[in-house]
Structures are given as structure tokens and as C-alpha cells.
Design a protein with these regions (language model features):
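Mid-core helix/loop region of P-loop NTP-binding domains shared across ATPases and GTPases
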Residues: 2-17, 54, 71, 90, ...
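Walker A/P-loop nucleotide-binding motif
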Residues: 52-75, 98
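Conserved catalytic segments around the Walker B and adjacent sensor/switch elements
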Residues: 56-58, 81-98
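Post-Walker A helix-loop "phosphate-sensing" segment adjacent to the P-loop in P-loop NTPases
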Residues: 76-88, 115-118
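A short, basic N-terminal segment
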Residues: 1-55, 77-80
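Hydrophobic helix-cap positions at the C-terminus of alpha-helices
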Residues: 44-48, 78, 82, 139-140, ...
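Acidic, polar-rich N-terminal leader regions of halophilic archaeal proteins
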Residues: 25-30, 63, 92, 152, ...
């Protein structure tokens, strides 16, 4: 059998300790230069650990400003602390670039609340939207606690299908209170600082109870981030 083209490469040591930390999809455990934004968001969301309803929020900033990474980090910490102290907090992250209709968002939220042994998925299509919403409310109350719905790229969703979904989600606590004890807040993440111009004033006032602006990283901050990623992802002395 002839020589395999990979034979000589396998004998070479890898440059990487952990290549995953260099990928765009990596969720870092440390977020340099975002302390101010983390402080503002956690100050609001800590209310969930006290059994209260956090304010709805919108996070603004250009692509690459760390909005998604910061939100995922905080929600992971929030959920972990809730388990530690016996408070049910249920964050759900929705990518509205791919899940981009009212039906699909509601179905995704509802199905995210199923336990591992439950198989009653809301179908990808086929139900009236009102029925999907009712099922979501029922499942949220069955799960209990405080639900944190994160709508990433919310500006894309609004521009495509309007603000009916946001109206329903911003008013969902009224439906939850009538039928149980669960509560909910909504966090929107937007690349467009002006996307709220597309919203009905009633939706705008309820969704934007608190705003957090993520400024772009400057050159020094980007250098710090790259050096941090390289330090944990690439073997020492591999770069010169």
C-alpha cells in the first residue's frame, strides 16, 4: 500500500492547545473590556434570582462588539446561580437570523422547555399561531420560575415580520399571571441602533425599558482579546 499523504504530517506536533477557543462560535469564560456592560445587565437580571421580574432590555452595538458573547456568559452564570440557591431561572437564546417568523420563534421557545423524557414537540408548521402561544404559556407556567428570552438579531426579525411577536412577548406576563406563577423578561440584541423606529410605540416602550450600548472595540482592546485567545489556544513559542 502506498504512502498516505497525511503520514508525514501526523508526526508534526500541533500548534494548538485548544483550537476551539480561536473560533468565532467559542463562548469565552472571560470577557475583557466589557465590565461596564456586564455590570449593567447583571444588575437588572439579578432580580430573577430574587423571584422578581427583570426589566426588558435592548442591547445595541455593531457586529463583533461582544453582545452575544456577553449575554450568553451572563445567562449561563445566572442559570448556574439559580440552581445553586434553588431558584428556577430559565434563559433561552433565539437566533432570529435563522428562526425568523413569529410561529418559529414561539415553537422554538415552547420546545426548549420540554424535559429530556418529553416528546410533545410543537410541530415546525401546522398549528394556528394562537395555539402555539397558548402552549408556550402553559409550558412556561409548568416549568415555573423566571424565564429570560433572548432574541438575538431582533432587528432582522422585526424588519422581516413586524412587531406582533414582540407585542405578545412583552405582554406575556399578563397571560402567565392568569394561569400560574411563572414570569418572563425579554432581552433583544440588535446591530441596528435605529431598529426601534420600526416598532409600534406601545411595543417600543415595553421592550426598551433598559438599553445597553456596546461600543466597538478599539485597536488596543482587540489586541488584548487576540493575545488572550492565543495564550489559551496556541502552544507557547508557536508564534513569533
Amino acid at each position: 500500500m502506498g504512502e498516505n499523504i497525511f503520514d508525514n504530517l501526523l508526526s508534526h506536533p500541533s500548534l494548538f492547545v485548544n483550537k476551539e477557543v480561536l473560533r468565532h462560535s467559542h463562548h469565552p469564560s472571560e470577557l475583557p473590556h466589557r465590565n461596564k456592560e456586564i455590570k449593567a445587565i447583571r444588575f437588572n437580571l439579578v432580580e430573577a434570582l430574587k423571584g422578581q421580574i427583570p426589566s426588558n432590555m435592548v442591547l445595541y452595538g455593531v457586529t463583533g462588539a461582544g453582545k452575544t458573547a456577553v449575554t450568553r456568559f451572563i445567562c449561563s452564570q445566572l442559570e448556574g446561580k439559580g440552581k445553586q440557591i434553588g431558584k428556577s431561572v430559565n434563559p433561552v437564546h433565539v437566533n432570529c437570523r435563522t428562526i425568523d417568523t413569529q410561529y418559529r420563534v414561539l415553537a422554538f421557545l415552547g420546545n426548549s422547555l420540554l424535559k429530556d423524557n418529553e416528546k410533545e414537540d410543537i410541530p415546525f408548521t401546522g398549528w394556528p399561531t394562537d395555539r402555539v402561544f397558548e402552549e408556550l404559556v402553559k409550558r412556561m407556567n409548568e416549568r415555573g420560575g423566571v424565564h429570560v428570552i433572548v432574541l438575538d438579531e431582533i432587528d432582522h426579525l422585526v424588519k422581516k415580520v413586524g412587531d406582533d411577536l414582540l407585542y405578545n412577548l412583552c405582554n406575556i406576563n399578563d397571560d402567565l399571571k392568569r394561569r400560574g406563577q411563572a414570569r418572563c423578561c425579554v432581552i433583544g440584541i440588535s446591530n441596528d441602533l435605529k431598529f426601534t423606529e420600526y416598532l409600534d410605540p406601545r411595543v417600543k416602550s415595553r421592550l426598551g425599558q433598559e438599553d445597553v450600548i456596546f461600543s466597538p472595540y478599539d485597536a488596543v482592546q482587540l489586541k488584548d482579546i487576540l493575545e488572550y485567545r492565543a495564550e489559551i489556544g496556541i502552544k507557547t513559542n508557536s508564534l513569533s
